């Protein structure tokens, strides 16, 4: 069975504003919620409304849907069909609770293991360090399990007790009278903060949190060829996990300082090489600096300013190991600002000989004179 158009589901046109989408969703969600509606197929209709709102209320998902239809909306966002929770971790009971207050709906077990938070660290490298890679020892602030209480939060020699108010479930039932009748919501127990356990005697080191703030030294290997703005993931070096869950990850964001001579374009290195008029006109062999050392470059006679030469394999290594970039040398003629009398005489003599040459410049001069 094919899906209905999301705009049609909410009774809207494609140009509907965000506010119109939200109002339509609230109205239809109340109408079809299974706890209230007695209509046939209310659950399916509610899910359909919820699915449409999940896509159209998000600018990125809506743009994908407008361009590609249901195929675009379901690509890269984990899908929306069925009766499970969305990627944000809430079900339709949780959404409905926003209309009536409380915190009803299905909740995650507060004592289940959870991964720790990810951390981000910024580093600045010199141009050459980014080309060849480097090992760094960084010191970052992290929250680690308290050594005194082993992360329990309870004073050594004591243990946590089951919360008497929620019987260890971490949730309590709250009844509310609404225009639709009496609604029973499940919400986090305020006495144990939803953990289902109480700490009678708190650890004096961490004050019951089970964590302490530390500065941790971590060795980070910067791969050769990394570029400005790229990041490195160091697995398991983020914040400590909760309830025995795995630690988060550390993301090292790299910034590369600019170089006075070199520029970078992907894996290639670009530089400009100043040459004299004589070197360009007569040809020469010059030394060009590269990050790998100086190399000799032959300049053919008659080379024009702006000509680009390629030095194969003298660029940056690809950060993923796919070969090596090149270096491109752009030559520029340098016009001297101070000349001796002898140099001026030589140039005047050269200019006089050029006028006799039927070159492009000669043709241009005649054109301006109307010849």
Swiss-Prot record:
Residues 5-69 form the J domain. PANTHER family: CHAPERONE PROTEIN DNAJ, DNAJ HOMOLOG 1, MITOCHONDRIAL-RELATED. Pfam families: DnaJ, DnaJ_C, DnaJ_CXXCXGXG. InterPro entries: DnaJ (IPR012724), DnaJ_C (IPR002939), DnaJ_domain (IPR001623), DnaJ_domain_CS (IPR018253), HSP40/DnaJ_pept-bd (IPR008971), HSP_DnaJ_Cys-rich_dom (IPR001305), HSP_DnaJ_Cys-rich_dom_sf (IPR036410), J_dom_sf (IPR036869). This is Chaperone protein DnaJ. GO terms for cellular component: cytoplasm. Homodimer. Zn(2+) 2 binds at residues 163, 166, 189, 192. Zn(2+) 1 binds at residues 146, 149, 203, 206. Gene3D superfamilies: 6.20.20.10, DnaJ domain, Urease metallochaperone UreE, N-terminal domain. It comes from Bacillus anthracis. The keyword Zinc-finger applies. Belongs to the DnaJ family.
């Amino acid at each position: 069975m094919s899906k209905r158009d999301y705009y049609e589901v909410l009774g809207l046109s494609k140009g509907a504003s965000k506010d119109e989408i939200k109002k339509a969703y609230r109205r239809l969600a109340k109408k079809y919620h299974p706890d209230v509606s007695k209509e046939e197929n209310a659950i399916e209709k509610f899910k359909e409304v919820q699915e449409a709102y999940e896509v159209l209320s998000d600018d990125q998902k809506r743009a994908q849907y407008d361009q590609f239809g249901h195929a675009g909306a379901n690509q890269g966002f984990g899908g929306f069909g069925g009766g499970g929770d969305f990627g944000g971790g809430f079900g339709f009971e949780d959404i409905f609770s926003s209309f009536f207050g409380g915190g009803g709906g299905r909740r995650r077990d507060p004592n289940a293991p959870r991964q720790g938070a990810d951390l981000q660290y910024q580093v600045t490298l010199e141009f050459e360090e980014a080309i060849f890679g480097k090992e760094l020892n960084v010191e970052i602030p992290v929250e680690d399990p308290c050594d005194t209480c082993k992360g329990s939060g309870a004073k050594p020699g004591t243990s946590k007790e089951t919360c008497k108010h929620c019987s260890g479930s971490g949730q309590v039932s709250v009844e509310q009278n609404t225009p639709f009748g009496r609604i029973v919501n499940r919400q986090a127990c305020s006495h144990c903060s939803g953990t289902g356990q109480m700490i009678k005697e708190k650890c004096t080191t961490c004050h019951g949190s089970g964590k302490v703030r530390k500065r941790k030294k971590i060795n980070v290997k910067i791969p050769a060829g990394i570029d400005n703005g790229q990041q490195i993931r160091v697995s398991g070096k983020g914040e400590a996990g909760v309830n025995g869950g795995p630690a988060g990850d550390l993301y090292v964001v790299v910034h590369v300082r600019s170089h006075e001579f070199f520029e970078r374009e992907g894996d290639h290195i670009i530089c400009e090489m100043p040459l004299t008029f004589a070197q360009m006109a007569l040809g020469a062999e010059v030394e060009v600096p590269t990050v790998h050392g100086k190399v000799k470059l032959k300049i053919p006679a008659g080379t024009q300013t702006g000509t680009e030469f390629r030095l194969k394999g003298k660029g940056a290594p690809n950060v993923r190991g796919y070969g090596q970039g090149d270096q491109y040398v752009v030559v520029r003629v340098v016009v001297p600002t101070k000349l001796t009398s002898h140099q001026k005489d030589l140039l005047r003599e050269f200019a006089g000989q050029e006028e006799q040459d039927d070159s492009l410049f000669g043709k241009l001069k005649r054109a301006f004179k109307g010849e």
